[in-house]
């Protein structure tokens, strides 16, 4: 690589680091976790949601392959942690990062998301399309929530469910003044240049 190429590469890296810092500025830390998802497009969509909502990380357990094109480069800015589908390893990661477990699951004691009061550092765990979340994680979660559904088939797409819960959390943070940029940075229908609020 030439000196000119190195200079450009360093400038790009510096710009990316600056944009990443600005991108996360003022938003509360939270994570999205997926337990053994079998449909790759769902993972890609969750990564895009995590990026749009400025999640600190996405935790994937089990399956290592996922639909990178569905993420639309959001994976460049969102940390993706891959773990084995091991309950002990997952618990250890939550403790290490200081996350409070919030399971998204249809269960008898689930709280409707409309009534949910989320903990300060939630990690929203979604279960596999077939099988759901391991029962021991449901039992020890700080909160178990479900999304109200009025249709005859009580089953939302996993990525859609994750998006709904994340944005319910952000809406509640906004109501108490927890978001520095509640408009998501949109000005006049466009995203301004980072570091220049006027675009």
Task: Give the residues covered by each predicted segment.
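Post-transcriptional modification and biogenesis factors for structured RNAs
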Residues: 1-199
């Amino acid at each position: 690589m030439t000196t000119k190429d190195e200079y450009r590469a360093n400038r790009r890296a510096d710009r990316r680091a600056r944009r990443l810092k600005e991108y996360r500025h003022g938003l509360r830390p939270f994570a999205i976790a997926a337990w053994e998802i079998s449909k790759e497009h769902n993972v890609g969509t969750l990564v895009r949601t995590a990026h749009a909502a400025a999640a600190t990380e996405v935790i994937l357990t089990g399956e290592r392959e996922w639909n990178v094109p569905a993420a639309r480069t959001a994976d460049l800015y969102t940390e993706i942690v891959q773990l084995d589908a091991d309950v002990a390893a997952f618990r250890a990661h939550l403790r290490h990062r200081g996350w409070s477990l919030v399971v998204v699951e249809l269960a008898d004691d689930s709280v409707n998301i409309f009534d949910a009061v989320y903990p300060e550092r939630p990690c929203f765990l979604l279960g596999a399309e077939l099988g759901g979340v391991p029962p021991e994680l449901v039992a020890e979660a700080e909160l178990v929530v479900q999304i109200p559904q009025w249709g005859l088939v009580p089953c939302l797409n996993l990525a859609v469910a994750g998006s709904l819960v994340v944005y319910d959390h952000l809406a509640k943070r906004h109501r108490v003044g927890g978001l520095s940029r509640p408009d998501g940075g949109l000005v006049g229908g466009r995203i301004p240049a980072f570091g220049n609020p006027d675009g």
